Amino acid sequence: MQRRIFGIETEFGVTCTFHGQRRLSPDEVARYLFRRVVSWGRSSNVFLRNGARLYLDVGSHPEYATAECDDLVQLVTHDKAGERILEDLLIDAERRLSDEGIGGDIFLFKNNTDSAGNSYGCHENYLVGRSGEFSRIADVLLPFLVTRQLICGAGKVLQTPRGAVYCLSQRAEHIWEGVSSATTRSRPIINTRDEPHADAERYRRLHVIVGDSNMSEVTTLLKVGAANLVLEMVEQGVQFRDFSLDNPIRAIREISHDLTGRRTVRLAGGREASALDIQREYYGRAVDHVARRGSDPMSERILDLWGRALDAVEHQDYSLIDREVDWAIKLRLLERYRNKHGLELSSPRIAQLDLAYHDIRRGRGLFDMLQRKDLVDRATEDGEIEAAKDTPPQSTRAKLRGDFIAAAQAAGRDFTVDWVHLKLNDQAQRTVLCKDPFRAVDERVERLISSL
């Protein structure tokens, strides 16, 4: 598999249930969550020793952006490390609340919608070459991303005027544009704002904001892995059938509501195609591409998962993927509970289970319960996730950032970092600019660290 820099940014939903008379707003709860961060970072926007960025986003949503990763399992591991870091903040915040006489349970949800209809995202980042034609990448990717929910949606019980329906995607109802430079106002599928966080003459960052937040490690692996294969093909000039959509926004919603994958959507040229038709085209090209360029274990794993997910939808046999793909895992859980208790899909108890699936608190969240019972498959291990809370990826620029932060903190020195800059806030204001995200060794950074 061709080397590429990946990153995932995840916004988390926050809520709190209180035991006594005292109540706090979501903003106040979020501030309690970040109090420990602010105490050492003097800000609610910090970079961590593992190279990641942690900050409080608009609307009291904690956001975790993984460090630069160049391997899919590494990316999944660092994405999960973000959950563990936020879980630690949650436990600390509950302790603070208790110490101040405010009894309460804080909940952090790795999902994309709250009960008030607000949406928050999971953004994927892919480094692409500046030389390629970005508009072609967007044109080819758009139909793939609109239909990708078949293989990696998080699943959601949606209450509609005609009753409750089970949907493939949480995010689909909240996307309003195909390609745009905005992220919050219009919520496009692909964000075109040109911020490469790298050498702008060589690289561009593809920012995909249509995806669901995934609890399943394997779903995250497939989500990013399949998109990476499509990108690889576009970069190497593979030709695709034209599946340009007449109305991508209508299509993404219609596809989300159809678990059969067979409902057709209108294409720009007047033809019609189903989500399965479109995904089969991309999948078939990917199989041929990997066979031509030479296979590798990760490409084989992605193609196996991708193919089985499409087979599961086509044959309506979700057992093919109900240990690996979030929407199928959740559907199995909800259906078993419904059948056991004789409940309608619209039951508040089902809505509660739907939400609890995304609770990141171990021992309380339903996905964690399934994982402990060995009812879901994994892509990484607990020991690797624990290590990734403090250790940056060793093969990318993240190592330089993480090593610098750790050394500066150990030396008690004041510093400032972002994705490309490492700066000592001393009289000399020494700064190192790290423009190559693939570079994990840099003599300038080593000299800066040795001077501490």
From Swiss-Prot:
GO terms for molecular function: ATP binding; ligase activity, forming carbon-nitrogen bonds; magnesium ion binding; ubiquitin-like protein transferase activity. ATP binds at R53, T66, W419. InterPro entries: Pup_ligase, Pup_ligase/deamidase. The active site is at D57. Coiled coil: none annotated. The reaction mechanism probably proceeds via the activation of Pup by phosphorylation of its C-terminal glutamate, which is then subject to nucleophilic attack by the substrate lysine, resulting in an isopeptide bond and the release of phosphate as a good leaving group. This is Pup--protein ligase.
